[in-house]
Regions:
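Compositionally biased intrinsically disordered regions enriched in Thr/Gly
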Residues: 1-200
Length: 200
Protein backbone atom coordinates (compact mmCIF):
# COMPACT_ATOMS: atom_id res chain seq x y z
CA UNK A 1 0.00 0.00 0.00
CA UNK A 2 1.15 3.54 -0.70
CA UNK A 3 2.61 4.65 2.66
CA UNK A 4 0.56 7.84 2.48
CA UNK A 5 -2.71 5.89 2.41
CA UNK A 6 -4.35 4.87 5.65
CA UNK A 7 -6.76 1.97 5.87
CA UNK A 8 -10.18 2.14 7.46
CA UNK A 9 -13.51 3.67 6.63
CA UNK A 10 -13.42 7.14 5.16
CA UNK A 11 -14.58 9.93 7.44
CA UNK A 12 -16.71 12.66 5.91
CA UNK A 13 -17.69 16.16 6.86
CA UNK A 14 -20.84 17.99 5.80
CA UNK A 15 -20.60 21.42 4.26
CA UNK A 16 -23.95 23.12 4.17
CA UNK A 17 -25.14 26.65 3.64
CA UNK A 18 -26.51 29.04 1.06
CA UNK A 19 -24.77 30.37 -2.05
CA UNK A 20 -26.65 32.65 -4.42
CA UNK A 21 -30.17 31.23 -4.86
CA UNK A 22 -29.11 27.77 -3.71
CA UNK A 23 -29.22 25.83 -0.48
CA UNK A 24 -26.51 23.19 -0.53
CA UNK A 25 -25.45 20.18 1.52
CA UNK A 26 -22.20 18.50 0.48
CA UNK A 27 -20.40 15.48 1.93
CA UNK A 28 -16.62 15.80 1.62
CA UNK A 29 -13.85 13.52 2.93
CA UNK A 30 -12.29 14.72 6.17
CA UNK A 31 -8.59 15.50 6.17
CA UNK A 32 -6.22 12.91 7.54
CA UNK A 33 -6.00 9.83 5.32
CA UNK A 34 -4.56 10.81 1.91
CA UNK A 35 -4.25 14.59 1.37
CA UNK A 36 -4.25 14.62 -2.47
CA UNK A 37 -7.50 12.61 -2.54
CA UNK A 38 -9.13 14.82 0.07
CA UNK A 39 -7.90 18.04 -1.52
CA UNK A 40 -9.39 16.96 -4.84
CA UNK A 41 -12.88 16.58 -3.34
CA UNK A 42 -12.64 19.77 -1.33
CA UNK A 43 -11.67 21.70 -4.44
CA UNK A 44 -14.64 20.15 -6.26
CA UNK A 45 -16.87 21.37 -3.43
CA UNK A 46 -15.44 24.89 -3.54
CA UNK A 47 -15.85 25.01 -7.31
CA UNK A 48 -19.45 23.89 -6.99
CA UNK A 49 -20.18 26.56 -4.39
CA UNK A 50 -18.56 29.26 -6.54
CA UNK A 51 -20.78 28.21 -9.42
CA UNK A 52 -23.88 28.47 -7.24
CA UNK A 53 -22.93 31.99 -6.16
CA UNK A 54 -22.76 33.12 -9.77
CA UNK A 55 -26.23 31.81 -10.60
CA UNK A 56 -29.17 34.10 -11.23
CA UNK A 57 -32.87 33.55 -11.78
CA UNK A 58 -36.01 33.73 -9.67
CA UNK A 59 -36.23 30.06 -8.68
CA UNK A 60 -34.73 28.53 -5.55
CA UNK A 61 -32.18 25.77 -6.03
CA UNK A 62 -31.46 22.74 -3.85
CA UNK A 63 -28.22 20.83 -4.25
CA UNK A 64 -27.06 17.73 -2.39
CA UNK A 65 -23.84 15.78 -2.91
CA UNK A 66 -23.19 12.44 -1.20
CA UNK A 67 -19.71 10.89 -1.16
CA UNK A 68 -18.94 7.19 -1.49
CA UNK A 69 -15.47 5.67 -1.24
CA UNK A 70 -15.53 2.49 -3.33
CA UNK A 71 -12.01 1.11 -2.94
CA UNK A 72 -8.97 1.68 -0.72
CA UNK A 73 -6.19 -0.91 -0.79
CA UNK A 74 -2.70 -1.57 -2.14
CA UNK A 75 -3.83 -1.04 -5.72
CA UNK A 76 -6.11 1.99 -5.74
CA UNK A 77 -8.05 4.67 -3.92
CA UNK A 78 -11.34 5.37 -5.67
CA UNK A 79 -14.65 7.05 -4.99
CA UNK A 80 -17.45 9.21 -6.34
CA UNK A 81 -19.79 12.04 -5.61
CA UNK A 82 -23.47 11.67 -6.51
CA UNK A 83 -24.99 15.12 -7.01
CA UNK A 84 -28.72 15.85 -6.95
CA UNK A 85 -29.93 19.28 -8.02
CA UNK A 86 -33.41 20.73 -8.28
CA UNK A 87 -34.53 24.15 -9.49
CA UNK A 88 -37.92 25.36 -8.26
CA UNK A 89 -40.43 22.51 -8.32
CA UNK A 90 -38.84 20.66 -11.22
CA UNK A 91 -37.51 17.13 -10.95
CA UNK A 92 -34.06 16.30 -9.70
CA UNK A 93 -31.09 16.45 -12.07
CA UNK A 94 -28.51 13.77 -11.28
CA UNK A 95 -24.79 13.82 -12.00
CA UNK A 96 -21.68 12.05 -10.75
CA UNK A 97 -18.04 13.03 -10.27
CA UNK A 98 -15.45 10.28 -9.82
CA UNK A 99 -11.76 10.08 -8.96
CA UNK A 100 -9.33 7.16 -8.90
CA UNK A 101 -5.82 7.54 -7.50
CA UNK A 102 -3.16 4.90 -8.18
CA UNK A 103 0.06 4.27 -6.22
CA UNK A 104 2.49 7.11 -6.78
CA UNK A 105 -0.13 9.39 -8.36
CA UNK A 106 -1.02 12.70 -6.79
CA UNK A 107 -4.02 13.32 -9.01
CA UNK A 108 -6.95 11.36 -10.48
CA UNK A 109 -6.02 9.01 -13.31
CA UNK A 110 -8.03 8.47 -16.51
CA UNK A 111 -9.23 5.07 -17.62
CA UNK A 112 -6.51 4.37 -20.24
CA UNK A 113 -3.82 4.44 -17.53
CA UNK A 114 -5.22 1.18 -16.11
CA UNK A 115 -4.47 -0.77 -19.28
CA UNK A 116 -1.39 -1.99 -21.07
CA UNK A 117 -0.81 -0.11 -24.35
CA UNK A 118 -3.34 -1.17 -26.96
CA UNK A 119 -5.37 -3.32 -24.56
CA UNK A 120 -8.05 -0.74 -23.77
CA UNK A 121 -9.74 -1.44 -27.11
CA UNK A 122 -11.03 -4.69 -25.60
CA UNK A 123 -13.04 -2.80 -22.98
CA UNK A 124 -15.83 -1.22 -25.10
CA UNK A 125 -17.32 -4.58 -26.21
CA UNK A 126 -17.41 -5.70 -22.55
CA UNK A 127 -19.20 -2.52 -21.55
CA UNK A 128 -21.64 -2.83 -24.46
CA UNK A 129 -22.47 -6.42 -23.49
CA UNK A 130 -23.29 -5.36 -19.93
CA UNK A 131 -25.39 -2.39 -21.07
CA UNK A 132 -27.42 -4.59 -23.42
CA UNK A 133 -27.83 -7.08 -20.58
CA UNK A 134 -29.32 -4.35 -18.37
CA UNK A 135 -31.92 -3.61 -21.02
CA UNK A 136 -32.71 -7.24 -21.82
CA UNK A 137 -33.16 -8.15 -18.15
CA UNK A 138 -35.33 -5.10 -17.57
CA UNK A 139 -33.11 -3.91 -14.74
CA UNK A 140 -32.93 -0.45 -16.26
CA UNK A 141 -35.20 1.27 -18.80
CA UNK A 142 -32.85 2.07 -21.68
CA UNK A 143 -33.27 3.28 -25.25
CA UNK A 144 -33.35 0.73 -28.07
CA UNK A 145 -30.05 2.03 -29.44
CA UNK A 146 -28.33 2.00 -26.04
CA UNK A 147 -25.71 -0.43 -27.39
CA UNK A 148 -24.49 2.09 -29.96
CA UNK A 149 -24.85 5.03 -27.59
CA UNK A 150 -22.74 3.42 -24.87
CA UNK A 151 -19.82 3.07 -27.29
CA UNK A 152 -20.06 6.68 -28.49
CA UNK A 153 -20.38 8.08 -24.98
CA UNK A 154 -17.70 6.01 -23.23
CA UNK A 155 -15.62 8.58 -21.36
CA UNK A 156 -12.16 8.11 -19.78
CA UNK A 157 -13.22 9.90 -16.59
CA UNK A 158 -16.59 8.25 -15.99
CA UNK A 159 -15.44 5.24 -14.04
CA UNK A 160 -14.48 4.09 -10.57
CA UNK A 161 -13.03 0.93 -9.05
CA UNK A 162 -14.55 -1.47 -6.53
CA UNK A 163 -13.19 -4.61 -4.94
CA UNK A 164 -14.86 -6.67 -7.68
CA UNK A 165 -14.21 -4.74 -10.84
CA UNK A 166 -14.35 -1.63 -12.98
CA UNK A 167 -17.59 0.37 -12.85
CA UNK A 168 -18.47 2.47 -15.89
CA UNK A 169 -21.38 4.91 -15.76
CA UNK A 170 -23.25 7.25 -18.08
CA UNK A 171 -24.91 10.63 -17.51
CA UNK A 172 -28.63 11.03 -17.05
CA UNK A 173 -30.65 10.79 -20.30
CA UNK A 174 -27.72 9.48 -22.39
CA UNK A 175 -28.64 5.77 -22.49
CA UNK A 176 -32.22 6.02 -21.32
CA UNK A 177 -34.98 8.37 -20.19
CA UNK A 178 -34.62 10.62 -17.18
CA UNK A 179 -36.09 7.95 -14.92
CA UNK A 180 -33.16 5.62 -15.73
CA UNK A 181 -30.89 7.78 -13.58
CA UNK A 182 -27.16 7.17 -14.10
CA UNK A 183 -26.85 3.75 -15.79
CA UNK A 184 -23.85 1.91 -14.36
CA UNK A 185 -22.28 -1.41 -15.32
CA UNK A 186 -19.60 -3.42 -13.53
CA UNK A 187 -16.91 -5.27 -15.48
CA UNK A 188 -15.33 -7.94 -13.21
CA UNK A 189 -11.55 -7.90 -13.13
CA UNK A 190 -11.32 -11.52 -14.25
CA UNK A 191 -12.87 -10.55 -17.59
CA UNK A 192 -9.95 -8.17 -18.16
CA UNK A 193 -7.21 -10.62 -17.25
CA UNK A 194 -3.97 -9.82 -19.04
CA UNK A 195 -5.18 -6.34 -19.99
CA UNK A 196 -4.64 -4.36 -16.78
CA UNK A 197 -1.30 -2.93 -15.70
CA UNK A 198 -2.12 -3.17 -11.99
CA UNK A 199 -2.88 -6.20 -9.77
CA UNK A 200 -6.48 -5.35 -8.98
Amino acid sequence: MDPAWKTGDVQTQTWEGRAGPADYRLEVPALGSFPPFERFWREQARRLIRGLRSMGGPWPVELHASFQETRRDDAALSGFWDISRRTGHAGWDLSRVTATFLPGSGSPQPLPVLFYPGRQRRLPPLVQREVLGLRQRGECLLFRDCGARCLRELDPWRYYLTGEGLAVFYPQEVLGPRSAGLPTVLIPFDRMEGQLRFPF
